[in-house]
Amino acid sequence: MSTVVLRSNGNGSRRRRQRVARRRPAARTQPVVVVASNGPARRGRRRRPVGPRRGRTPRSGGGSRGETFVFSKDSLAGNSSGSITFGPSLSEYPAFQNGVLKAYHEYKITNCVLQFVSEASSTAAGSISYELDPHCKASSLASTINKFTITKTGARSFPAKMINGLEWHPSDEDQFRILYKGNGASSVAGSFKITLRVQLQNPK
C-alpha cells in the first residue's frame, strides 16, 4: 500500500481570509469637534418678582383723585375787564365751587387751559389782554403783553408750576387768578372756555 500525502500551499486559506476581510467594512471613526467658548456662559432669564417695581408707590384706595372740569365765561364784550379766581371763589362754575370742592379737604389745580373763542366779525378791531396772578394778590391788570385778538380763536396753557399747583391747598383757600381787559368795542367779542385738571384728596 502506498500512502499519498497532500500538502496545502496555504493559498486557499489566504483567499478565504481576503474574502472575509472584503466583506467586513472598516469601522468609520467620526471626529469629535469641541468648540471653545471665549465668553462667559449665558444665564437664563430671571423672572420678575411679583409686585410693584422699586421706586414706584402703589396706589391705594385712599389716594388722591383726578378730575377734569370744563366751563365757559360767555358774552365777553370787546371792552370788558375783570378776573377769574380759581378755588372756592370760582363763581363762574358753581359745580366746582359748591360741589366737588366742598367734598374734599384739599385740592390742587395742576393744569389750566384758557381758550378765547372768537364771536366777533372779521372787521372788528381790538384785543383782550390777560395776566396770570399765581398768588391771588392783584386786583387789576398790570400788563398787556399777553393778549388774544378778538377776531381769532386762541389758547394758552398754564402748567402746575406757573399756577401754584405743586402744593396742596385747603379747600377754603383760592389757588390762583387770571385777570383780563379788552380794548375793543362794547359789542360781544367772544367767550372764554376754561379746562382745569384738578387733584383732590382727603374726602370729608
Curated annotation (Swiss-Prot):
InterPro entries in the record, alphabetically? Luteo_coat, Viral_coat
**Keywords recorded for this protein, A-Z:** Capsid protein, T=3 icosahedral capsid protein, Virion
What residue spans carry the Low complexity bias annotation? 27-41
Q: Bias category Polar residues: which stretches? A: 1-12
> Which GO terms of the cellular component aspect does the record hold?
T=3 icosahedral viral capsid
Q: Output compositional bias ranges, type Basic residues.
A: 13-26, 42-57
Taxonomically, the superkingdom here is Viruses
- UniProt-recorded Gene Ontology molecular function terms: structural molecule activity
The protein's predominant localisation is virion
Region described as Disordered? 1-74
Give its localization.
Virion
Something else the entry says is:
The N-terminal region like those of many plant virus capsid proteins is highly basic. It has been suggested that these regions may be involved in protein-RNA interaction.
What does it do?
Answer: Major capsid protein.
The similarity comment for this entry is: Belongs to the luteoviruses capsid protein family.
Protein name, UniProt field: Major capsid protein
Its organism's taxonomic lineage begins at: Viruses, Riboviria, Orthornavirae, Pisuviricota, Pisoniviricetes
